[in-house]
A protein has these predicted regions:
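Flexible, low-complexity junctional segments that flank or bridge functional domains
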Residues: 1-107, 115-121, 136, 178-180, ...
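Conserved acidic, small-residue-rich alpha-beta core segments centered on
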Residues: 86-223, 228, 233
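C-terminal cap/linker of serine protease catalytic domains
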Residues: 233-239
Length: 239
Protein backbone atom coordinates (compact mmCIF):
# COMPACT_ATOMS: atom_id res chain seq x y z
CA UNK A 1 0.00 0.00 0.00
CA UNK A 2 1.48 3.34 -1.00
CA UNK A 3 0.26 6.86 -1.49
CA UNK A 4 1.74 9.90 -3.19
CA UNK A 5 2.22 12.55 -0.51
CA UNK A 6 4.79 14.90 -2.01
CA UNK A 7 2.16 17.53 -2.75
CA UNK A 8 1.93 18.30 0.96
CA UNK A 9 4.91 16.54 2.59
CA UNK A 10 7.37 18.77 0.73
CA UNK A 11 5.69 21.90 2.16
CA UNK A 12 5.67 23.29 5.72
CA UNK A 13 2.87 21.81 7.88
CA UNK A 14 1.67 25.30 8.84
CA UNK A 15 -0.69 23.92 11.48
CA UNK A 16 -0.36 22.57 15.01
CA UNK A 17 -3.16 20.91 17.00
CA UNK A 18 -1.49 21.67 20.32
CA UNK A 19 -1.00 25.38 19.52
CA UNK A 20 -4.57 25.61 18.26
CA UNK A 21 -5.80 24.26 21.60
CA UNK A 22 -4.06 27.20 23.30
CA UNK A 23 -6.02 29.64 21.11
CA UNK A 24 -9.35 27.85 21.54
CA UNK A 25 -8.95 27.63 25.31
CA UNK A 26 -11.13 25.40 27.47
CA UNK A 27 -14.36 27.36 27.05
CA UNK A 28 -14.73 27.25 23.25
CA UNK A 29 -18.15 26.46 21.75
CA UNK A 30 -18.98 23.82 19.16
CA UNK A 31 -21.70 23.55 16.51
CA UNK A 32 -22.09 21.26 13.47
CA UNK A 33 -18.49 20.10 13.92
CA UNK A 34 -17.15 23.67 13.96
CA UNK A 35 -15.24 24.96 16.99
CA UNK A 36 -15.46 28.67 17.67
CA UNK A 37 -14.13 31.23 20.12
CA UNK A 38 -13.90 35.00 20.59
CA UNK A 39 -10.31 36.12 21.21
CA UNK A 40 -9.54 38.77 23.84
CA UNK A 41 -9.00 41.37 21.08
CA UNK A 42 -12.62 40.85 19.91
CA UNK A 43 -11.70 38.84 16.81
CA UNK A 44 -13.91 35.80 16.17
CA UNK A 45 -12.32 32.44 15.30
CA UNK A 46 -14.02 29.42 13.69
CA UNK A 47 -12.17 26.17 13.01
CA UNK A 48 -13.81 24.02 10.35
CA UNK A 49 -11.81 20.79 10.15
CA UNK A 50 -14.04 18.90 7.71
CA UNK A 51 -16.90 19.29 5.26
CA UNK A 52 -17.85 15.58 5.55
CA UNK A 53 -20.91 16.17 7.74
CA UNK A 54 -23.66 18.60 6.94
CA UNK A 55 -23.76 22.04 8.54
CA UNK A 56 -27.26 23.03 9.61
CA UNK A 57 -28.58 26.41 8.48
CA UNK A 58 -29.92 27.00 12.00
CA UNK A 59 -26.51 26.20 13.47
CA UNK A 60 -24.85 28.71 11.15
CA UNK A 61 -27.40 31.36 12.14
CA UNK A 62 -26.65 30.69 15.81
CA UNK A 63 -22.86 30.85 15.40
CA UNK A 64 -22.83 34.01 13.24
CA UNK A 65 -25.32 35.73 15.57
CA UNK A 66 -23.09 35.03 18.56
CA UNK A 67 -20.03 36.36 16.72
CA UNK A 68 -21.74 39.45 15.24
CA UNK A 69 -20.34 41.68 18.02
CA UNK A 70 -16.77 40.95 16.87
CA UNK A 71 -14.59 43.28 14.78
CA UNK A 72 -13.61 40.59 12.28
CA UNK A 73 -13.78 36.84 11.66
CA UNK A 74 -11.12 34.18 11.06
CA UNK A 75 -12.25 30.95 9.37
CA UNK A 76 -9.54 28.32 9.71
CA UNK A 77 -9.73 25.48 7.16
CA UNK A 78 -6.13 24.28 7.54
CA UNK A 79 -5.91 20.46 7.51
CA UNK A 80 -9.49 20.28 6.22
CA UNK A 81 -9.29 17.52 3.60
CA UNK A 82 -12.75 18.25 2.20
CA UNK A 83 -16.02 16.36 2.09
CA UNK A 84 -19.29 17.54 0.56
CA UNK A 85 -19.22 20.38 -1.96
CA UNK A 86 -22.74 21.38 -0.87
CA UNK A 87 -21.55 21.84 2.74
CA UNK A 88 -18.64 24.02 1.61
CA UNK A 89 -20.99 26.05 -0.58
CA UNK A 90 -23.49 26.48 2.29
CA UNK A 91 -20.80 28.06 4.47
CA UNK A 92 -19.50 30.33 1.68
CA UNK A 93 -23.06 31.52 0.96
CA UNK A 94 -23.04 33.33 4.33
CA UNK A 95 -20.40 35.80 3.09
CA UNK A 96 -22.07 37.36 0.06
CA UNK A 97 -25.14 39.55 -0.39
CA UNK A 98 -25.40 38.97 -4.14
CA UNK A 99 -25.05 36.20 -6.72
CA UNK A 100 -21.38 35.90 -7.75
CA UNK A 101 -19.65 34.02 -10.58
CA UNK A 102 -17.02 31.89 -8.83
CA UNK A 103 -15.78 29.66 -11.64
CA UNK A 104 -16.47 27.00 -14.25
CA UNK A 105 -16.71 23.20 -14.33
CA UNK A 106 -16.27 20.66 -17.15
CA UNK A 107 -17.33 17.01 -17.29
CA UNK A 108 -15.71 14.03 -19.02
CA UNK A 109 -17.57 13.25 -22.26
CA UNK A 110 -15.48 10.45 -23.81
CA UNK A 111 -12.34 8.28 -23.56
CA UNK A 112 -10.02 10.77 -25.28
CA UNK A 113 -7.50 12.81 -23.29
CA UNK A 114 -9.27 16.08 -24.07
CA UNK A 115 -12.86 14.80 -24.18
CA UNK A 116 -14.47 17.31 -21.83
CA UNK A 117 -17.66 19.33 -22.04
CA UNK A 118 -17.69 23.09 -22.58
CA UNK A 119 -17.01 24.71 -19.16
CA UNK A 120 -20.26 25.59 -17.40
CA UNK A 121 -20.50 28.64 -15.10
CA UNK A 122 -20.63 28.01 -11.33
CA UNK A 123 -22.35 30.63 -9.19
CA UNK A 124 -22.41 31.37 -5.47
CA UNK A 125 -25.80 32.58 -4.27
CA UNK A 126 -26.36 34.27 -0.90
CA UNK A 127 -28.31 32.50 1.84
CA UNK A 128 -31.47 34.57 1.69
CA UNK A 129 -33.40 35.16 4.94
CA UNK A 130 -30.39 33.85 6.88
CA UNK A 131 -27.68 35.50 8.99
CA UNK A 132 -24.84 36.63 6.70
CA UNK A 133 -21.47 38.00 7.81
CA UNK A 134 -21.09 41.67 6.82
CA UNK A 135 -17.62 42.57 8.16
CA UNK A 136 -14.10 41.64 7.07
CA UNK A 137 -13.18 37.94 7.16
CA UNK A 138 -9.94 36.00 6.73
CA UNK A 139 -9.66 32.36 5.62
CA UNK A 140 -6.56 30.43 6.81
CA UNK A 141 -5.15 27.78 4.46
CA UNK A 142 -2.32 25.27 4.15
CA UNK A 143 -1.36 22.45 1.75
CA UNK A 144 -3.71 20.04 3.56
CA UNK A 145 -6.69 22.19 2.57
CA UNK A 146 -7.94 20.27 -0.46
CA UNK A 147 -10.87 18.77 -2.36
CA UNK A 148 -14.14 20.49 -1.26
CA UNK A 149 -12.03 22.85 0.88
CA UNK A 150 -10.18 23.98 -2.25
CA UNK A 151 -13.58 24.78 -3.76
CA UNK A 152 -14.59 26.67 -0.59
CA UNK A 153 -11.40 28.77 -0.73
CA UNK A 154 -12.01 29.59 -4.40
CA UNK A 155 -15.56 30.77 -3.61
CA UNK A 156 -14.35 32.87 -0.68
CA UNK A 157 -11.34 34.38 -2.44
CA UNK A 158 -13.48 36.18 -5.00
CA UNK A 159 -15.56 37.97 -2.34
CA UNK A 160 -14.59 41.62 -1.68
CA UNK A 161 -14.47 41.42 2.13
CA UNK A 162 -12.59 38.10 2.33
CA UNK A 163 -8.80 37.65 2.38
CA UNK A 164 -6.91 34.33 2.18
CA UNK A 165 -3.86 34.07 4.47
CA UNK A 166 -1.42 31.16 4.90
CA UNK A 167 -0.03 28.74 2.33
CA UNK A 168 -1.19 27.53 -1.08
CA UNK A 169 -4.05 25.03 -0.85
CA UNK A 170 -3.64 21.38 -1.83
CA UNK A 171 -5.89 21.55 -4.90
CA UNK A 172 -8.12 18.72 -6.04
CA UNK A 173 -11.32 20.68 -6.55
CA UNK A 174 -12.76 18.43 -9.24
CA UNK A 175 -15.39 15.84 -8.37
CA UNK A 176 -13.47 12.62 -7.53
CA UNK A 177 -13.84 9.39 -9.49
CA UNK A 178 -12.78 6.11 -7.85
CA UNK A 179 -12.06 2.78 -9.53
CA UNK A 180 -10.11 -0.46 -9.03
CA UNK A 181 -7.52 -1.77 -11.49
CA UNK A 182 -7.33 -5.52 -12.39
CA UNK A 183 -4.28 -5.91 -10.11
CA UNK A 184 -6.29 -4.70 -7.10
CA UNK A 185 -4.92 -1.17 -6.98
CA UNK A 186 -7.40 1.58 -6.18
CA UNK A 187 -7.22 4.78 -8.18
CA UNK A 188 -8.94 8.05 -7.37
CA UNK A 189 -8.73 11.18 -9.49
CA UNK A 190 -10.62 14.35 -10.31
CA UNK A 191 -12.96 13.65 -13.22
CA UNK A 192 -14.50 17.11 -13.49
CA UNK A 193 -11.91 19.89 -13.90
CA UNK A 194 -12.77 23.11 -12.10
CA UNK A 195 -11.59 26.61 -12.98
CA UNK A 196 -11.77 29.97 -11.25
CA UNK A 197 -13.73 32.95 -12.60
CA UNK A 198 -10.74 33.82 -14.85
CA UNK A 199 -10.66 30.25 -16.27
CA UNK A 200 -7.47 29.40 -14.36
CA UNK A 201 -7.17 25.72 -13.33
CA UNK A 202 -7.87 25.07 -9.62
CA UNK A 203 -6.63 21.48 -9.62
CA UNK A 204 -3.12 22.26 -8.37
CA UNK A 205 -4.03 24.62 -5.55
CA UNK A 206 -4.96 28.24 -4.87
CA UNK A 207 -2.40 30.84 -3.83
CA UNK A 208 -3.22 32.88 -0.74
CA UNK A 209 -3.64 36.66 -0.94
CA UNK A 210 -1.02 36.97 1.81
CA UNK A 211 1.52 34.15 2.14
CA UNK A 212 2.54 33.37 5.73
CA UNK A 213 4.38 30.35 7.14
CA UNK A 214 4.39 29.38 10.81
CA UNK A 215 7.85 30.18 12.18
CA UNK A 216 9.69 27.73 14.43
CA UNK A 217 10.42 30.58 16.88
CA UNK A 218 6.70 31.29 17.25
CA UNK A 219 5.84 27.60 17.54
CA UNK A 220 8.28 27.21 20.43
CA UNK A 221 6.31 29.96 22.21
CA UNK A 222 2.93 28.34 21.37
CA UNK A 223 2.20 31.18 18.94
CA UNK A 224 0.48 30.53 15.59
CA UNK A 225 2.12 32.93 13.12
CA UNK A 226 -0.75 32.57 10.64
CA UNK A 227 -3.50 33.32 13.18
CA UNK A 228 -1.51 36.33 14.41
CA UNK A 229 -1.14 37.63 10.83
CA UNK A 230 -4.91 37.31 10.38
CA UNK A 231 -5.63 39.20 13.62
CA UNK A 232 -3.26 41.97 12.60
CA UNK A 233 -4.88 42.19 9.15
CA UNK A 234 -8.41 42.36 10.58
CA UNK A 235 -7.50 45.08 13.08
CA UNK A 236 -5.90 47.19 10.35
CA UNK A 237 -8.99 46.78 8.12
CA UNK A 238 -11.61 47.26 10.82
CA UNK A 239 -14.80 48.90 9.56
Amino acid sequence: YSQYREWFDSYPANFSDSIQRVYLGKDYAQSSGMKYQIFEDNIAYIYCGSFQSGIGEGNLDEVLNKLAICDGLIIDVRNNSGGNLTTAEKLAARFTNEKVLVGYMSHKTGPGHNDFSTPKAVWLEPSLDRVRWQKQAVVLTNRRSFSATNDFVNRMKILPKVTIIGDKTGGGSGLPFSSELPNGWSVRFSASPMYDADMQHLEFGIDPDIKVNMSSEDMQRNVDTIIEAAREYLHSHKE
